[in-house]
Structure formats: C-alpha cells, structure tokens
Amino acid sequence: MTTRSDFDRSLETWLADVRPTSPPGWLLDQTRERLAETDRRSQWLIPDRWTWNANARRVVAGGRIVLVAAVLLLIVLAALAAVVLVGAPRPAPPFGLTTAGYITLDSADGIVVARIDGSDRHVLVPPDGQSISPIWSRDGLHLAFWHRARTVGPWSLVVVGRDGAARHVIAEGVTLREREESLNQPSSITWSPDSQRMAYAADTPAGSAIFVGDIEGGATAITDPKLKGIDPAWAPDGTSIVFVSETSTTLHSVAPDGTGEHQLATLKDIVLWPDWSPDGASLAVSAAVDDQLDVFTVSADGTTVTNVSHDPSAEFSPSWSPDGSRLAWARAPADESARAWVVVSDRAGTRIVELRVPADLAPPVWSPDGTRLYSYVMDDAERFYQLLVLDPEGVAPPVRIQADGNVGNGSWQRLP
C-alpha cells in the first residue's frame, strides 16, 4: 500500500520535473489537507452521513423537495401532452384529401387504389379477367372482391392483403344476381367486425342464400334458399347477420353459424340495402311505400320502424357515418332530366344538407374519418362513370375526380 509519505515524495519528484523553478511547498500543503479530508470522509458510516452537519441536512431536504416537485411537474406536463395529442380535436385535412385511408375502385385497369385526389394511383389487382365490388375489411388489412376469368360465367370470392399479395380464394363457382353485378349497386359482401369472416348472397338452384366464408378459405350457406336471402349486413357486435328475404319483403336475422334465424321486421313491398348504425342500435334500409322508395330506420329488435326521408323522389342506399350521428343516401328525381342529390340527415331524419350532383347517382360512401363522401356519376359527354367527392357539410363544392376508363363499385380503406 502506498503511504502518504510515499505520495509526498512522488509528488515532489513530479513537480520538480515539471516545474523545477517553482517551490512545491504550497501545493504539498494543499494536497495534504485534501487527502486528510478524504480520509476522514472514508470513515463515515451511511447512517451517519445525514448527521454530520446541520447545513447538509437542510441542503439534502431542499434537494428532496426540488426532486419531488420536478417529478410532479413532469407528470402534469405528460398528462397535458396526452390531452393535446389524443383528446383534442384535430383539423380536417384539405378538402379532397384524407389521412384516413385510400379509396379502392374496380375499373378497366383492374382494382385500383389511389388517394382521393387521384395521386398515388396504383393497380392492386391486375385486370386478368373481371374483378368487381371490392370492399375492405374493417381493420383495413384485407380486401375482398368478386373475380372471374372471363366477362361471363360464375364468380369466385377472393381476398388479398393490403399489397395485393396473400391471395385466398374463399369460394368458387358462385352465381351472382344480375343486380349485384351492376356498377351502381352496393357491394354484396359484408365483413365481420373482427375482419376474419365475410357474408355474401349467392344464387343456388333452390333460390338465393346467405353464405359465410372464412378468410383462409371455404364458405357455408347459413340460410334456407326458400327465403331468397339478399343484402346481408353483419351486426357491429358480431352476433348476428341481418338480411332481406325477397319471398316476403321482410328483414330477417340469423347467427353467423346459421342458428336462430327469425323475422326481424316487416316493411311494405321492396326492402333493400340494410346498413347497421355503428352502435348497433338500429338499421337503415330502403323500402317501397306506395311504389315509392324511401329511407327507413329500424330498431335492432325490429319493434320500431321510422320513415326518415318523406320525399316524393326515390330515395335509396342509406349509409351511416362512422360516428353514427348522420345518415347519407341517394335521391333520384322522378324527372330524369333533373339533377340527383345526396341527402345528409341526423339520426331522426332532420336534413342537414342536400348536395346536388349530376344524374345517374350511385350509393354514397363515407370516408373512415367521416369528413368526406364519394359517389359515382355518369359523365354526360364521355358516357362512363367517374368519381365525385362531396363535402357532407355542404361547404366545399363537389370535386370530380377524372378516372381512366369506367369505374364501378368501390370501398374506402381504413389505415391500420
């Protein structure tokens, strides 16, 4: 072990080498004092450190208070940041754009994905045959659509991933009704809330039936073809599927495994396109009254049916906003030379805005963030459908999106 006298001698030698003309005595004295202080402190026991000096106790206590205050301040600032970033309302993106996802269309180029302003346009499913009615799963990770190799013949239900890969054939040899092959009809496919299954209507030799398919492949009929089930809509809680029976123009409900089928509500004449409110409390449907299509809401248990449109024009294809506060539907005037409209109302049917658009209107579709609507309109000059973007508040004018060739049914993708 090196002694203090050894250290003194070593320090003297070093100072002599470095500064031979400077007397080292003053530095030796200062160094001895510091070593002595260090030696005294090395003899402290941990419990004794807080009793060695009254001033030290005050300093330590004050330091503790400052530390606690700093921690509390950080917690408060973190909470305020969370409120600002999560809870505060965010400004909507510029009209015609959305950060909520991409719009997906069936077109002459195959199934195309693009931003609503037409940018970042790319082909998700190549035009190898015919692909129609694309619809995104609720988590935005999978796209289902109908496909066939030629322009005639049976269809296959196909699912792909967000990038168009991981292709699964859910069902083959499916015969769709002519109405469901139309450009201006809602998709006949409905996703389960967990995005693992889908329901659809297909013709069988005995009549139309509702089928449920698994995302990995395979499908099973869950309704009696004698009911001629069409237009399935999967409930938000996943426990039931509502569909329309063409046999009796009634709404029916059935569990996804085919059990518990029962009549939910009876409406007059034609019933079409049921759509669940996001909270599962009610459905919106199109139904004919005195040969006139109107929009109705139906309570989840079928006990309350309310006409929310009350208009002499044909009003159809209702669609709930993502937050369930509004309904949008299409209105076709009796006079074919007149313009069509998209109507936006609250849940009670009180009209918020009526958006005038060109004729041959297709069903309106909400963006996932509820800030936009889109529909298809027939271009009078070119005679093919194009995309029309609408502001549901009626403030900004409609924006027509030019498309290459015909466009048909589409879906708005929610980004995961």
For every predicted segment, state its role.
Residues E33-L35, T51-A54, P93-F95, G101:
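N-terminal membrane-targeting/anchoring modules of bacterial envelope and secretion proteins
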